[in-house]
Amino acid sequence: MQNKYPLLSQINSPEDLRLLAKEQLQSVADELRAYLLESVSQTSGHLASGLGVVELTVALHYVYQTPFDQLIWDVGHQAYPHKILTGRRDQMHTIRQKNGIHPFPWREESLYDVLSVGHSSTSISAGVGIAVAAEKENAGRKTVCVIGDGAITAGMAFEAMNHAGALHTDMLVILNDNEMSISENVGALNNHLARIFSGSIYTTVRDGSKKVLDKVPTIKNFMKKSEEHMKGVISPESTLFEELGFNYIGPIDGHNIDELVKTLSNMRELKGPQFLHIRTKKGKGYEPAENDPIGYHGVPKFDPTCGQLPKSKTIPTYSDIFGNWLCEMAEQDSKLIGITPAMREGSGMVEFSKRFPEQYFDVAIAEQHAVTFGAGLAIAGYKPVVAIYSSFLQRAYDQLIHDVAIQNLPVIFAIDRAGIVGADGQTHQGAFDVSFMRCIPNMTIMCPSDENEMRQMLYTAYRMNTPTAVRYPRGNAQGVALAPMQALEVGKGKLIQQGQKVAILNFGPLLNEARIVAEKHNYTLADMRFVKPLDEQLVAELADSHELLVTLEENAIQGGAGSAVNEYLQKIGKIRPLVMLGIPDFFVPQATQAESYADLGLDAAGIEQRIQAVVNQ
């Protein structure tokens, strides 16, 4: 490694980086970018975001005394360069793998990871808390939050900035704006003015003038307006952040490491809330990623020399099946509306957005708004479908209850990534949606066992006039044939196999694993389909005719489908031995989906072992 990366190989911590001359930093950035590309192409992971913040990462760790100074990355997709510079360079080959380093900043992993993240727009709120604590302790430490132009659109980010401005907290928010390539207003003039506005002479004169002019409000207001006008000429965005109480600097070139170091060095000495706007290019330095930053956002293993990603398998994903269903229904119903909170690609809605632009709404990273926006459409007679990841629906729980369920509005929730998601780890597992939805009156919850069932359930939800949820997993579908759409009888499961002694009640896509066990031991197998309303008649019949009941689901055991079965049996006084298989009471770490199923006992071998342990007692 030393021959290929002569500078980077010597950097085992930011302390090593800070020993280098400033003139060497661009070479460090070049090596870091090359190493990042080499590493991610061999492991899979998030690529384009990290390529875009290489210079910023080097400059931040060079100027700020991390880990004493607190550096917080929002979401964490862009934090791979940060991990490489903070002692984890030689472990990058394990990222996103079982027992490897975490795909996002993770407090348990490193002192340099101040906040564990994975979801967006949390950095500034945590940063305000950390900065307030530092002020109370007179610690002298600095707090820096790096947030992207997507994440900053979320309401939580503005709530935090509004609070920070009111508190006049010493902290720096850096907006990494990579929505477009470096534009004409990011150049010599902007870089020069950024140094002026962030410099000690300017800020000392400005702050001193404010104190003197407090007694002359007319002149004070004139000077304030003049400063705002000058900043506004350079960057119209500045007014918004200035009104929130931040001193706005920028935009500056986020790939000019000399200017970044100069500006950050100035801003580190400033008091109060500071806001630095930088412009970067997502995928910087690797042309295919620059040209297709969305495609190279998260990548599988690939050969970077060929300039293209490997083609996906021919079996469609559950997300693809959902997108196709949405298009099929939109052809028949112009009042069907598809809604996504900034997850068009992940949720399989690209084709729908192109074919039916008038029926498609991307509301940005605003899950709360997405749900209540859907409620408003339902009130007006439309048929909204909110396509959302299970872990992101958590962010809109009050809206689900207050704005949809209480009013019994026909909003369809297409819940993607339900269950075990794999390499993204704890923050992205879809482990809780059944539990937190099942207790809500008026909700109908469906768990398809394959893509055909999924289509029928989505169609069933479309035909209903109440809140509905269809939850389906990440990854490839089963490859079964798709039948013509037909509404299912609500609350009715189906018997897959009649057996003896043991009955397995399956909820969701683990049906094939259960089938292997049922066929081997001649157990009864039922595909329950609905968590709510539960097929109580089928549960009662199986309880009467079997010695042991086993529930199987990809959700937390607490409050899940198994709990629903247990509650019903208690209600009717049928006390039977019951084994509830699902996700235990801990946050499931990163691994492949297959590895997680095995670890949790949710594959065929694990299911068989758990059942046999009870049968043999």
Curated annotation (Swiss-Prot):
Function statement: Catalyzes the acyloin condensation reaction between C atoms 2 and 3 of pyruvate and glyceraldehyde 3-phosphate to yield 1-deoxy-D-xylulose-5-phosphate (DXP).
GO CC terms, sorted: cytosol
Gene3D superfamilies per the UniProt record, alphabetical: 3.40.50.920, 3.40.50.970
Coiled-coil parts of chain: none
Residues annotated for thiamine diphosphate binding in this entry: 77, 118-120, 150-151, 178, 286, 367
Top-level division of the source organism's lineage: Bacteria
Gene Ontology molecular function terms on file: 1-deoxy-D-xylulose-5-phosphate synthase activity; magnesium ion binding; thiamine pyrophosphate binding
Subunit structure: Homodimer.
Entry's family note: Belongs to the transketolase family. DXPS subfamily.
Classification via InterPro entries: Dxylulose-5-P_synthase, THDP-binding, Transketo_C/PFOR_II, Transketolase-like_Pyr-bd, Transketolase_BS, Transketolase_C, Transketolase_CS
Cofactor: Mg(2+); thiamine diphosphate
EC number: 2.2.1.7
Positions of Mg(2+) binding: 149, 178
Protein name: 1-deoxy-D-xylulose-5-phosphate synthase
